[in-house]
Structures are given as structure tokens and as C-alpha cells.
Amino acid sequence: PSALAAGLTGRTPKYGLHLDENRLPTKRFCVKYQPKDLTDWGILGAIIGKNLGSYWEVPLIEALEVIPNSDEMKHMGAAMASYGSTPLFHLHKITPEAKNLKIEQFNNLDLIDINSSDFESLKSSFGSKGDKIDVVVFAAPQLSIVEMQKVANLSKDKSFKVPVIVCTSPQVYADSIRMGFIEKIENSGAKVLQGTCFYQQYAREIGEANGWKKLLSNSTKIVNILGGYGYTPALATMENCILSAVKGEIV
């Protein structure tokens, strides 16, 4: 309702994160294990979100050795919001409001270290090598054109034993048709959907109708959500999701 009202009036409430004082960091996180792929970035977001668990908490994330690209930041932010209802984060010396932040002014905040063991603990709670799978889903967040290209290249000359569902936006879908990505993906037996996301389209009913229980994805956000829709979700990198779809089990 508030978003609709803002669209109609051109105004938003002077409230929450629209106020500068509410955008300041409330907790610090020191990243001591550097994410290596999209799944790792999602796991990082999940770890931070679980430690926050509140709309009003704003994390300041420190010690990243690389600047994440848009897809990496997308997966991190999506997982952070899924696990912690966290709408805003700062990456020290990277994101606009944190480029000139002086760490010293936040020395009074709790500082939480994030280690490789934290990554492994979360990852191991979602499936194990050799587990049979019923469906592979790439969604939540919807795939960018870069991700579509990667799925297309990984799917080339493959034949999937289980259904593979890929969700993207209408614009990226149109671009992917023009660039030949959709053809490559669907030639392997996968299905590309546009303008939707898997968990928003009666995911429970789809699973029950098809007998799907074990779902594999590279999205830390979606495996968190779909546990509440009757699935037993598992997590793997995009590459291993594709290989698992070929084999019918987690590789």
C-alpha cells in the first residue's frame, strides 16, 4: 500500500531508511574467507542476515579483497534479505555511502568475524554429494544476461535427467533469444520462464503434482525459501547444478 501511495502522490513517508540517521551501520562484519562464486556470495549474505534478523540492523562489511560485480552483489543482497529482512548494507570502501567511512567511528559496534567454517557450516546444511535430486532451479534472483550466457554455455551438448527451470526477466529473455542463449538452454531439455520466479508460482502445488521433493539450486535465497514449500532444498555452484542435472544426483 505505501509503495502504491508513493507512486500516486510522488511522496514517501519520512521514515525508516529514508532518514540518514537510520542508514548508519549498527554492526560490523569482517570477512576472513573470500567468496569465490555466486553461491559463496549468497552464503555470505545468508550468514550476515542470520546474524542480524531485523529491518533496523545495518551491516558494515569489511575486509573484502575484491569488488563484487552486479550479480555477486545481487546474490548477496537477496540472501541477506531472505535470512535477515535486511534492506540495506554497506561494503567498506566500495558502496557509495561507505567509500569514505572511517572505521574508527564505529569501534563501539559489535564486530563479527566470518570464516571458512561459517561458509562450510551453512553449505553443508543443504544437501550432500550423491543425494538424488528431482529438479534443478535457477531463480530468486532472476538471472541476468551474463548468468543466462553462462547457463547456456554450461548446458551446451548436455542432456538432463531431471527437469531444469531457469527464470529471468522479460527484457533479459528477449535479449537471450536474440543472442541464442534460450535455444542452447532449451535444447538440453531445460525450460526458461520469463517475468516470474519459481517460488511465486505455486511452487508447493507444482512440486506435489510432479512428485518433486529434492530441489537443487545455486541460489542461497531460494533454498532458504523453498524449505517452507514442501521441498528438501540443496545448494551447489551453477557448474555443479548443471552436472548434477545431467547425472540426476548431486556431484
Predicted features and spans:
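Non-transmembrane, aqueous-exposed alpha-helical and coiled segments at domain scale
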Residues: P1-V251
